[in-house]
């Protein structure tokens, strides 16, 4: 099959180009620009790479950044105090807390501490509630937004489509299920306790995989007309990463597929920055 590999980087670059123009307009009109605060706890190598990429892309479109790098040994209450400082800083448009956090920190308390109006990641319970209630307000998790944008690019009319999401995380599975329901898909969420997974995924028009298990889903899990969205990022050797789908053996057996890297990762960052711009616009009532 020719040209069935989805170039997430190219799609993300289109979004970034639009954001750059929009931010240039802000600067001319208001003499201000968005600013994203990134809270990084500890020195997890993978987290540091993700943060570096977010900062790089932010600067490319004209978003200022503030990196708040804190000790692994910080207490939950002290981290909340730091987040409250950022909440009160009128120069900060959006705030994200890089996950995962050390096990000693209460993640739910931290995500709830971020002001909902500055919640660029869309993880605050209020924003989660808006999404699942179908209220067009607040912020939606970036990876879920990125997945939906890719799906709609290749299947503009989702009415009645069968979508299967493998993985039930708060970052991908649950929010994406809400978004696809709003697009009138019939949505099935599968997880580690699902029996006969391939019998479910092989009937789907759209399969999104986000389980954190390298090369887990092979060709028999999909039908030839499927759009396959691979959200997994797994390090399988010192210098190689792979998704949750056996890409090399699946790519010729499906209609469209996202690669890893170069698929959903760039789209996630693009929508993080898009959320930050949205927060900035809301704050100054543009």
From Swiss-Prot:
The keyword Membrane does not apply. Its EC number is 1.5.1.5, 3.5.4.9. SUPFAM superfamilies: Aminoacid dehydrogenase-like, N-terminal domain, NAD(P)-binding Rossmann-fold domains. PROSITE patterns: THF_DHG_CYH_1, THF_DHG_CYH_2. CDD domains: NAD_bind_m-THF_DH_Cyclohyd. It comes from the Bacteria. It catalyses: (6R)-5,10-methylene-5,6,7,8-tetrahydrofolate + NADP(+) = (6R)-5,10-methenyltetrahydrofolate + NADPH; (6R)-5,10-methenyltetrahydrofolate + H2O = (6R)-10-formyltetrahydrofolate + H(+). GO terms for molecular function: methenyltetrahydrofolate cyclohydrolase activity; methylenetetrahydrofolate dehydrogenase (NADP+) activity. GO terms for biological process: L-histidine biosynthetic process; methionine biosynthetic process; purine nucleotide biosynthetic process; tetrahydrofolate interconversion. GO terms for cellular component: cytosol. Keywords: Amino-acid biosynthesis, Histidine biosynthesis, Hydrolase, Methionine biosynthesis, Multifunctional enzyme, NADP, One-carbon metabolism, Oxidoreductase, Purine biosynthesis. It holds the Pfam family THF_DHG_CYH_C. NADP(+) binds at residues 167-169, 192, 233. Pathway: One-carbon metabolism; tetrahydrofolate interconversion. Homodimer. PANTHER family: C-1-TETRAHYDROFOLATE SYNTHASE, CYTOPLASMIC, C-1-TETRAHYDROFOLATE SYNTHASE, CYTOPLASMIC-RELATED. Catalyzes the oxidation of 5,10-methylenetetrahydrofolate to 5,10-methenyltetrahydrofolate and then the hydrolysis of 5,10-methenyltetrahydrofolate to 10-formyltetrahydrofolate. Belongs to the tetrahydrofolate dehydrogenase/cyclohydrolase family. This is Bifunctional protein FolD. It comes from Rickettsia prowazekii (strain Madrid E).
């Amino acid at each position: 099959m020719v040209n069935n590999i989805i170039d997430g980087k190219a799609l993300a670059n289109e979004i970034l180009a639009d954001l750059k123009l929009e931010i240039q307009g802000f600067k001319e009109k208001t003499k201000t620009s968005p600013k994203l605060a990134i809270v990084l706890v500890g020195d997890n190598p993978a987290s540091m790479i993700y943060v570096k990429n977010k900062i790089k892309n932010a600067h490319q479109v004209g978003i200022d950044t503030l990196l708040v790098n804190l000790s692994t040994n910080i207490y939950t209450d002290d981290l909340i105090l730091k987040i409250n400082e950022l909440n009160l800083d009128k120069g900060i448009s959006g705030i994200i807390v890089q996950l995962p956090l050390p096990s000693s920190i209460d993640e739910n308390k931290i995500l709830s501490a971020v002001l909902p109006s500055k919640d660029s990641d869309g993880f605050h319970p209020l924003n989660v509630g808006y999404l699942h209630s179908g209220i067009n307000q607040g912020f939606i998790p970036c990876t879920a937004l990125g997945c939906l944008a890719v799906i709609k690019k290749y299947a503009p009319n989702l009415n009645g489509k069968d979508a299967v999401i493998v993985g039930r995380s708060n970052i991908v599975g649950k929010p994406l299920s809400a978004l696809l329901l709003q697009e009138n898909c019939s949505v099935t969420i599968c997880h580690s306790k699902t029996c006969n997974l391939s019998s479910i995924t092989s009937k789907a028009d759209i399969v999104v995989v986000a389980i954190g298990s390298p090369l887990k889903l092979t060709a028999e899990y999909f039908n030839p007309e499927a759009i396959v969205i691979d959200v997994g990022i797994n390090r399988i050797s010192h210098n190689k990463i792979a998704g949750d789908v056996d890409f090399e053996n699946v790519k010729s057996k499906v209609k469209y597929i996202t690669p890893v890297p170069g698929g959903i990762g760039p789209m996630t960052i693009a929508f993080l920055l898009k959320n930050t711009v949205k927060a900035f616009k809301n704050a100054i009532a543009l």
